[in-house]
Amino acid sequence: MQFVLHKTASGVTRARRGTVHLNHGDVQTPAFMPVGTYGTVKGMLPRDIEAIGADIILGNTFHLWLRPGTDIIDKFGGLHKFMHWDKPILTDSGGFQVFSLGAMRKITEEGVTFKSPIDGAKVFLSPEKSMQIQYSLNSDIVMQFDECTPYPATHDEAKKSLELSLRWGQRCVDEHKKLGSTNALFGIIQGSMYADLRKQSLEGLLEIGFDGYAIGGLSVGEPKEEMIDVLDYIANDMPADKPRYLMGVGKPEDLVEGVRRGVDMFDCVMPTRNARNGHYFVTGDVDNAGVVRIRNSQYRTDEGPLDPECDCYTCQNFSRAYLSHLNKCKEMLGAQLATIHNLRYYQRLMQGIRDAIEQDKFDEFVTEFYSKRGQTVPELNLR
């Protein structure tokens, strides 16, 4: 992997424009990665994902390991051929999914024992096993196995958790090298909401050495102000010559705020999940902060496109009234068209950000973004 930093925005922001060169292609940053949990972005054919402009998608190590299993994916030479996607893939390590199991799991120094959510069977996942699974998947970016610190956590709990993740991180690097993988391996910064612990985690990861660094343990129930606070004091301390990835955070305004603080990569289920629930992101809707809730009665007879500024297949061919009808009838096509639009909205947002950075107009872009949503630009408190 190679990361090329092309430009840093002028002004007070830390926005960056770059390219991540990976085994299956290049990723233009800042980038948003659609989530394909089971080897599919819900409701999207691979050609649809390419058409909306995505350079990279995310797969889920935990779920793909349990079903269909790496024995089957191995027969295809990895996840790319299995799902007919020839561009880059990032896979998470399974750490967040294990965290979400709650009482169904037991964490030790060696790894995590848990009951399979599929059949209740006892399963063990370790740093080494996570690396082996991701090696079989042949993902372009492999994530270290970590413990996602719950929120809220005491300082002592967060410290013990991050130190366990650091020890696991070293084991991940050792196993990654042992396997002879040529794919990139990213470390994950933990430490809950504590500035000193986030710094300790980052310093520990830098000592181990990774190809890129991610900010984990956010979007787990904390107030948005605390999430932004973490970004304010940790993002700029991350190496400038490596990609910076904010995990699982994905409201449009969160992406903009992350970029303002120097983040390069994002992922979230929000655009696809919200699409299935009738919430569509649009460029300009002052009254509704950039969201059309298609189930509202006002759209039943609306002949206009979902978003007049959008170039996606949905907006170019269908009315809000038709989308309202499909949603009301729970038609499969409705969810598919909504997903196409929401993911295209996210890719257009990131393209606009990249163009603005290149043209030294990022501050103007941010002002216009919030203005179209009827919001004021949040204050930057960089440290």
Curated annotation (Swiss-Prot):
Gene3D superfamilies: Queuine tRNA-ribosyltransferase-like. The keyword Transmembrane helix does not apply. One of its GO terms (biological process) is queuosine biosynthetic process. Substrate binds at D92, S93, G94, G95, F96, D146, Q190, G217. Zn(2+) binds at C310, C312, C315, H341. Homodimer. Within each dimer, one monomer is responsible for RNA recognition and catalysis, while the other monomer binds to the replacement base PreQ1. This is Queuine tRNA-ribosyltransferase. The gene is tgt.
